[in-house]
From Swiss-Prot:
PANTHER family assigned: LEUCINE--TRNA LIGASE, MITOCHONDRIAL (PTHR43740:SF2), LEUCYL-TRNA SYNTHETASE (PTHR43740)
Keyword Repressor: no
GO CC annotations, alphabetized: cytosol
Alphabetically ordered keywords of this record: Aminoacyl-tRNA synthetase, ATP-binding, Cytoplasm, Ligase, Nucleotide-binding, Protein biosynthesis
Annotated coiled-coil segments of the chain: none
Signal peptide: none
Stated family: Belongs to the class-I aminoacyl-tRNA synthetase family.
GO MF, any single term: aminoacyl-tRNA deacylase activity
Main location as per UniProt: cytoplasm
Protein name (Swiss-Prot/TrEMBL): Leucine--tRNA ligase
Organism ancestry: Bacteria, Pseudomonadati, Bacteroidota, Flavobacteriia, Flavobacteriales
Naturally occurring in which organism (per UniProt): Flavobacterium psychrophilum (strain ATCC 49511 / DSM 21280 / CIP 103535 / JIP02/86)
A Pfam family of this chain: Anticodon_1
Localization annotation: Cytoplasm
Gene (UniProt): leuS
């Protein structure tokens, strides 16, 4: 009876599906274990062998936990909103819903083929209206909340309104917009409804504001920083510029400190935690106000939100972590986008300033942060006044200052900051750049800045002279507060998250507008479903794609979507045209899995209380400052509102490494007329071009030239001259990220079809530690497949089952329990690769021992089951068991079988080992010596001589000294 993986795989995958073997219950007396993978975006390319790596690891843990008696929730779904589907719709005219469903069907087929124990009865899709109605509901809760710093939590907006009615806003301790005008309770009562709404927008956790965004004209939408690479969109490579737009934003900054402190309570890798700490960017210092010398007057409009803020144009507000260095301020730098730039720039400098702003708009914030070598800037012609010395300080703009961090302005102290030092020296001698001031006692700044706070005394600083860092900081803040030109402050780099996207394929906002102000649609009328549109591009007048819909207005009488032509702004109003970003649906999805068929709420309190939070989360580290941060933010908000039981959504996080592809390249000349073989390019200028692996010999790396010429991807080179090595064209090879665009993708279906799903599962784990990246090497697969065939032969010969009920040998029991111990420890420590090695050792040992005993082979099938579930189920069934192997308790290691009763002693003569002998460990040295001296091999070695000394160390060595 031969091992036939294709038959076995299909049989048990069908069995699991029909019996819903892995469906979890929300009411079990078993302890719960919730294990989750970051759900995939269903792209048209399908899965390659790199994608299942994390899923296989999580599946091993899920199956193991079931064996250990846990009620395991291991769900799967699809993050199905997103830009790629929309771009494909634009190109082909197909509705994104259609292509998304097709892609999901393909993903499901591939996932099923690998044999994952997902609870598919809980599948979710973020693009389904019955899912995103709850995303819309959460948005409404955020809109109707404010952050009370006194209670350190989000509260309902009605409590804020009540405080306004009683005492105005002067004593409100809230996270809100800066520089809100003070008002009394009487003022509040006298404000118009629209003005009250505008004020509340400055406190709400989701709000409308004019924001600097990454605008991609080619895609017609705003992009997040992590969607931009080297100044162009990750999707399509389109240029990205910075521009101001009125956008929905999320006040994630309210949770900055809690997000920071929460990292201490979760079991995540230190690298991910550090990424989030840096992104949150806590710094303690002071806010300082510098009076601007030649500002222009500012006219405010009653019709805009800005009428609620007092004029801040008399001062440049600066946050600094080094108020002790305030007497070292040599110049000031504003972000090019700073609102003061246009107000203070002199006519003489206007042209240079505008040219610089235009240039800067083409760079993303991430690029500007990363580029520490390039120095650029322009003098505005304006001056600020030093709060203590009253000296004039020139005001520059520079792209190393970001509008969204701090106040978008810095006080430049070149003697104490390397970047300020480089900037001052670069523009040394130019108009608006004074000499660098040195305020450190006995410190030489002739060649570099002195950035240390330690072991330095302040000098040339009036009342701060002779003080150290801590003393001078405290004194400077006190004096600034006396002048009413500063105060101590804790600042965070974390900025509020832009939540609007100008695209079609995303969650619609449950928002309509009355007199330009946002109104929430009542939750009982959700979902607000995406409308049909004729095209998915922005409208001709620049509105988002939803502007193409003829039916996108809200009727407040019928409480349903109405035709635009019926808008009367008395009962029927325009709906929001933007959609939510790609991260909206993934910011709470783990909670929906707890109760996915609940139509009334995103999950029942009972289900949430039972499952609580995710015990193990597996996914890529690239989400460190995106999804993982937003998910923590939403979870904390839902905790504040009483909907989540814990502060943190994911107790433990593992980031799987990548499986790398082995790419192939041909090398073209500059004129594209010649293609050089790899060994001939060292002295030539060439460009490497990725080659489809299907047209090369994987063993010899030889290119099939005729196939290359006929390949549709390379038709441009059909007439090119191939420069060969020894009559062959040898391609170059390089290990890099596996990607369809690099033509180095290996399809898991191909592996499953040829070797079976269990071979793929074992091989991916065998490649190396889960968290490391490793190259794919097809050559190793046959070894794993051979192991499974060898395992099969322990149970079957050509005639059928050969398992006996005989008593197993001590050696076989030792091999089994050694493996039970090792595999248990490995799974608990997530060291899956070493388990596969142990399985191979065990099967080799059992084969040598000619072991066919049920007492060994039945538990062996169970411990193999998490890794290779199909063959394990088949073996278990063939052994006469009717229930699924997944329901059986995991074997326990009995240490008594691991105790060594014998020892293989090396026997040496004058220190040279000549043979080995197996002896019981309980023998005394005298008994060992007696046995050794009678052994024929000893007699032969001594050749009639008597040893001078016999050295015996029990359990270790025997040495005869002649």
């Amino acid at each position: 009876m031969k091992y036939n993986p294709n038959e076995i795989d299909a049989k048990w995958q069908k069995n699991w599906a029909n019996n819903q073997t892995f469906a979890a219950s929300n009411t079990s007396i078993k302890p719960k274990y919730y294990i989750l993978d970051m759900f995939p975006y269903p792209s048209g390319a399908g899965l390659h062998v790199g994608h299942p790596l994390g899923y296989i690891a999580s599946d091993i843990v899920a199956r193991f936990k079931r064996h250990k008696g846990f009620n395991v929730l291991h769900p799967q779904g699809y993050d199905s909103f997103g830009l790629p589907a929309e771009q494909y719709a634009i190109q082909t005219g197909q509705h994104p819903d259609k292509t998304t469903k097709e892609n999901i069907a393909r993903y499901r087929e591939q996932l099923d083929k690998i044999g994952f124990s997902f609870d598919w009865s809980r599948e979710i899709r973020t693009s389904n209206a019955n899912y995103y109605k709850h995303t819309q509901w959460i948005f409404i809760q955020l809109f109707n909340s404010w952050y009370n710093k006194s209670n350190d939590k989000a509260e309902d907006i009605t409590t804020l309104i009540s405080l306004f009615q009683k005492e105005g806003n002067t004593n409100i301790n809230a996270v809100c917009d800066d520089n809100i005008a003070p008002f009394s309770a009487q003022d509040w009562t006298g404000f118009s409804s629209s003005k009250q709404q505008k004020i509340l927008l400055q406190y709400r956790l989701t709000y409308l504001a004019e924001t600097e965004v990454n605008w991609c004209p080619g895609l017609g939408t705003v992009l997040a920083n992590d969607e931009i690479i080297n100044g162009v969109s990750e999707r399509g490579g389109h240029p990205v510029i910075r521009k101001k737009m009125t956008q929905w934003s999320m006040r994630i900054s309210a949770y900055a400190e809690r997000l920071l402190q929460g990292l201490n309570d979760i079991d995540w890798s230190e690298s991910i935690k550090e990424s989030q700490r840096n992104w949150i960017g806590k710094s303690v210092g002071a806010m300082v106000s510098f009076k601007v010398k030649n500002q222009k007057s500012q006219v405010t409009s009653e019709a805009t939100l800005s009428d609620l803020r007092p004029s801040t144009l008399d001062y440049i507000e600066v946050f600094t972590t080094r108020p002790d260095t305030i007497f070292g301020v040599t110049f000031m730098t504003l972000a090019p986008e700073h609102p003061l730039v246009q107000e203070i720039t002199t006519p003489e400098q206007k042209a240079a300033i505008e040219a610089y702003i235009e240039k800067t708009a083409k760079r993303s914030e991430r690029e500007r942060m990363a580029d520490v070598k390039t120095i650029s800037g322009v003098f505005t012609g304006a001056y600020a006044e030093h709060p203590f010395t009253k000296e004039q300080i020139p005001v520059w703009i520079g792209d190393y200052v970001l509008a969204g961090y701090g106040t978008g302005a810095v006080m430049a102290v070149p003697c104490g900051d390397e970047r300020d030092y480089a900037f001052a020296n670069f523009f040394k001698g130019q108009n608006g750049m004074p000499e660098i001031k040195n305020i450190f006692d006995n410190v030489d700044i002739a060649t570099e800045a002195y950035g240390s706070k330690d072991n330095v005394i302040i000098a040339n600083s009036d009342f701060l002279n002779g003080l150290n860092y801590k003393q001078a900081t405290k004194k400077a803040i006190a004096e600034l507060e006396t002048l009413n030109q500063g105060k101590g402050k804790t600042n965070y780099r974390l900025r509020d998250a832009v939540f609007s996207r100008q695209r079609y394929w995303g969650e619609p906002f449950p928002v309509y507008y009355v007199n330009g102000l946002p109104q929430m649609i009542d939750a009982k009328h959700l979902p607000i479903a995406l409308p049909e549109v004729e095209k998915y591009l922005p409208t001709e007048d620049g509105l988002p794609p939803l502007g193409n819909s003829a039916k996108w207005a809200w009727n407040t009488i019928t409480n349903e979507v109405d035709f635009n032509e019926n808008i009367n702004n008395t009962t029927i109003y325009p709906l929001e045209l933007n959609t939510m970003p790609g991260w909206a649906g993934s910011s709470w999805y783990w909670m929906r899995y707890m109760d996915p068929h609940n139509d009334n709420e995103f999950a029942s309190p009972e289900a949430i209380k039972y499952w609580e939070s995710v015990d193990l989360y597996i996914g890529g580290s690239e989400h460190a400052t995106g999804h993982l941060l937003y998910a923590r933010f939403w979870n904390k908000f839902l905790k504040d509102k009483g909907y989540a039981p814990t502060e943190e959504p994911f107790k433990k996080l593992i980031n799987q490494g990548m499986i790398l592809g082995n790419s192939a390249f041909v090398y073209r000349s500059e004129d594209s007329k010649k293609l050089y073989s790899k060994g001939l390019i060292s002295d030539k200028t060439t460009q490497a071009i990725h080659v489809d692996l299907a047209i090369i010999n994987e063993t010899t790396n030889e290119l099939d030239i005729e196939a290359f010429k006929k390949h549709p991807l390379y038709s441009d080179y059909a007439n090119a001259e191939f420069i060969l090595e020894n009559g062959k064209y040898i391609v170059g090879r390089e290990v890099e990220k596996m990607s369809k665009s690099k033509y180095n993708v290996v399809n898991p279906d191909d592996i499953c079809n040829e070797y079976g799903a269990d071979t793929l599962r074992l091989y991916e784990m065998f490649l190396g530690p889960l968290e490391q990246s490793k190259p794919w090497n097809t050559a190793g697969i046959t070894g794993v497949f051979g192991f499974l065939k060898k395992l099969w032969r322990l149970y079957f010969d050509d005639n059928g089952l050969i398992v006996t009920n005989n008593e197993p040998s001590k050696e076989s029991l030792k091999s089994l329990h050694k493996t039970i111990k090792k595999v248990t420890e490995d799974i608990e420590n997530f060291s899956f690769n070493t388990s596969v090695s142990q399985f191979m050792i065990c099967v080799n040992e059992l084969g040598t021992q000619n072991c066919h005993e049920r007492a060994i082979l039945e538990p062996l099938a169970i411990i193999l089951s998490p890794y290779a579930p199909h063959i394990a189920e088949e073996l278990w069934s063939q052994l006469g068991n009717s229930e699924s192997i997944s329901t059986v308790a995991f074997p326990i290691c009995h240490e008594k079988y691991l105790v060594e009763s014998d020892k293989e002693y090396p026997v040496s003569f004058n220190g040279k080992m000549k043979f080995t002998i197996n002896l019981p460990l309980d023998l005394t040295p005298a008994q060992i010596e007696e046995i050794i001296m009678k052994d024929e091999r000893t007699i032969k070695q001594l050749d009639g001589n008597t040893p001078k000394k016999v050295i015996i160390i029990p359990g270790k060595v025997i040495n005869l000294v002649g």
